[in-house]
């Protein structure tokens, strides 16, 4: 009987959900591995967020005793804990590494990664090999997070702790902007690479060409391999990797040298013994480890016995003090190649002076040799890096300033415009990488708005042209790093005015009309506002023509950026290589068009229903690239109807692929070709989830619902970058 009970307990008949990824139960993904992943459009659902719905982090941050928090962080730096003692009695280097690695995942290609959501707390980042033992840094911060609670997010705390660490060791910073809002589960939309093993590097092709949009050289690394490319200790080859990786983070050579040299002025690397002594990472650790990973059995498992990267030693003889000793060591000695006690490649100074030895991490009376990584020597043996490094060596104040500016850029690059920054230490200076936009000095009444809309509709521009231009302007927005969008009207400027997807000749014609209207108005109104207002007016007209008298909400206040305020190279990465909303694709890619559509929708911050209603509406409004007929399932182009969905789902038609990759929609009885379509169009009838939305909007009783949902989604995209509206609303509440 006892055995029978034990057997019944083991079977657990009431446990009907799949709660473990390693469960032997088969999931939909197992059956259909190529199934379109729509979950990334809903990854931050309210259900995962423990805050009340009315919680506003920016409002809570305003209640923060900011200077008291900084003082608590400063004290923490030298309050060494027995469970994880501070090297040299100072946690500063550990917190700099934590902040750096939080921000350093950012890449300009798609704006994903970075510090703005605090995802270092979650898999995979919390368990990346390059983040080994940063779990200890986060645990050291917990008493402070517990004390200040909702007034400081983890994401902000990580970066502020890095700032305080630098300042507490004599380094310079130029400020801090709060406003990073925590997420509550991993970000599944970020593509970190296709490798299935840590430190694998299957992301290269040809002449070491790194796969887009990746920036790191290997799975599980933040930047580059410190031992050299694929672990080969070649400083010149390492320089090539460094340059490409930092470029993909938006950093130039000077910023790169400043960051590497400045960061390695502090602290040490840890490789006291063989890696076989190190336990599993946090996500693989046993439950009793309580989220701590990399528990080591080597010696004490901490302090001087710590194993992290496998490289062992400090870079400088003064590892808790800002100075130029990094360059003193780099250029003052020849270096010989050896292996650390953990077996990692590193370089040691030839015959170092006693004054250039570093203190032991635990015993300051004991002196130990310093070291350099292969990536450090790249700053000496790459000609361009060497010029910059020697200049910094000879000009300490310039070096300190360059590091402070590069550090601020590193830790704030993914926060978007300056209007999002919070706190008393926000720099007054505008930086070009913040994509600055002049503030507007006008307001518009409802009557004035209606008058301008009438002028636009009577200008000779079509509904299609007005909608296309507004979409082209606004849809550059990336919710990942809060860049792009309609504010600034950079669609008038290089490089956006020349992008293929924007149909430059037609765009120039539309912009010329808007400029004429602007000149005729009795008060100054930005082109940015006119573009969005024109799109809104067109949508209203299209809805009226469909029988629905509706208003499209419009909020003026956009400014017009200048070419001088626009970094052409930086903005080039925002060019869409595919935009399924316009049925545009620059060329054939290995990724199916429907996946590119979902990726675009995710970057715009759209849900699956919003993506669906926008595609259906934009097709009938004639918003396709170069007026291509694909997916325009209507005889009433320019009228906001649900025809796209009605005809997509009509079983009187069949869908037939052609050799050109386009699909023909044929009458089942006559064989007549009625319409043509792309995979982006057909996915709304093929994918069962998207089909359910298509059926919803095709219903006879949902025609008005379709119009209203389209308008809501349209306004969401038009205002996606209007952080000033959020700020004004917040200020009106707190006034």
Curated annotation (Swiss-Prot):
Gene3D superfamilies: 1.10.520.10, Peroxidase, domain 2. The active site is at residue 101. Binds 1 heme b (iron(II)-protoporphyrin IX) group per dimer. Its EC number is 1.11.1.21. One of its GO terms (biological process) is cellular response to hydrogen peroxide. Heme b binds at residue 264. Its cofactor is heme b. There is a cross-link at residues 100-223 (Tryptophyl-tyrosyl-methioninium (Trp-Tyr) (with M-249)). It catalyses: H2O2 + AH2 = A + 2 H2O; 2 H2O2 = O2 + 2 H2O. Optimum pH is 4.0 for the peroxidase reaction. The record marks 97 as: Transition state stabilizer. There is a cross-link at residues 223-249 (Tryptophyl-tyrosyl-methioninium (Tyr-Met) (with W-100)). Keywords: Heme, Hydrogen peroxide, Iron, Metal-binding, Oxidoreductase, Peroxidase. InterPro entries: Catalase_peroxidase, Haem_peroxidase, Haem_peroxidase_sf, Peroxidases_AS, Peroxidases_heam-ligand_BS. It comes from the Bacteria. Bifunctional enzyme with both catalase and broad-spectrum peroxidase activity. Also displays NADH oxidase, INH lyase and isonicotinoyl-NAD synthase activities. Belongs to the peroxidase family. Peroxidase/catalase subfamily. Homodimer or homotetramer. This is Catalase-peroxidase. The gene is katG.
